[in-house]
Amino acid sequence: FGNVAVCIHISGFNQICRYYGIPTYNADGYPGSKRPDYQSAYEKAFRAIFTGLSGGSSRPLHGGVYGELSHSPLQAVLDDDIAGMVGRYLEGMSVTDETMALDLIEQVGPVPGHFLGLAHTRKWWKQEQYIPKSSDTLTYPEWLQSGKKSCIDYARERMENIIATHKPMPLTERQEDDLERILDEARAHYQKTGQISSEEMSAYRASLASGR
């Protein structure tokens, strides 16, 4: 899955499909590694940047481990930083009169002038940067004082916090009605075409009624 030859193949595939206006689905998130580790990181990052640069339409990334055979919540948190960095890279550089800030350069002047105290610097630093959420960015003394944590440690803390505190937004009544209508249409279709028997449908409805 993480072989560089696959990246070359997918890049060519994406460009041909873009030429003909065909959407693509690239499997960025499926490394050969069996657990969250260095191999998983470089295989995923390498695939993600190349499929992004070559114009892939849909590029699933988060959580995949060992091809398409397993999923790890911890890996998903680590992958979120890969996705963020690749996304920021693909956004590119904004070159405008405001970002060039020639008037500020003239105003501040040469040494000992600096730009650190300017609102313009703070504004564009925040927009241009991507701050990873699970990376170790401390100085060496800070790293020692914090317990020598690795990216795996930070990702595990973030994962546990998300699991403990996340509250998904509930569906509206209209959304629930729409979903039920779509499911009813699908059930009717599969029964009509013989893909679901009456006995299977009865067992399915009984399971729904019991809440299992």
Go through each PLM region and give its residues.
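Glycine-rich anion/phosphate-binding loop at the beta-strand->alpha-helix junction
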Residues: F1-I82
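Catalytic-core signal marking the mid-to-C-terminal active-site face
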Residues: L74-R212
